[in-house]
Amino acid sequence: MTVSVTPCCCRSVKLTVLGKSYTAPLEVVADPRLTTGSADLTKQFDLLVKIRDQVTLTDETIIQIRDLREQINTVNKHVGSENKAVIDAGKSLDKKMTEIEEALIQTKAVSSQDVLNFPIRVNNHLVALSGVVSSAETAPTQQSYQVFDMLSKQVNEQTLKWKDIVATDVPAYNNLVKQQDVPALKITQPSGGT
């Protein structure tokens, strides 16, 4: 396990072995071969945390979109082809969600070779940026900050669209499903036999 910290003085560190705990003071010092000051290492750490937070925001949005898509598909199975209004509303909602999802991640890349045919999206760019920023024990370059700002803007635009969908489209869809009196449970009839 690797833990990344900047040089500092901590209060204590605790180790537990076979039920017995040991506590000792700990001071984290920089590699003496480095000429980088602690302020530069702190800048690096701070940018890496910001990148991590944007990747987390992206991933959480994708998880919510995919979960909602599964729920829409479940409702579609319950209503069958008879209820065109619910089916069409679900398709419309899914189309909006897909636009956001495809802006944040590359949904068509399945194998490692697929990135040759389908360009990577914001999430992959953020992950690559974290590799660049962490590749040297120094403050991030101005270009790293600029790329982060550009990518963050793209993530924030998409998450704002997502929040708007959650605030308006999802309640409208739920109201339509309620109005159409879609059954919560439906017994599937056997396909044959007696």
In which residue ranges do the predicted regions lie?
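Glycine-centered tight-turn motifs at strand-turn-strand junctions
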Residues: 1-7
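Low-complexity, Pro/Ser/Thr- and charge-rich linker/hinge segments at domain boundaries
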Residues: 23-57
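Mature extracytoplasmic or organellar-lumen-exposed domains after removal of signal/transit peptides
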Residues: 24-26, 30, 57-194
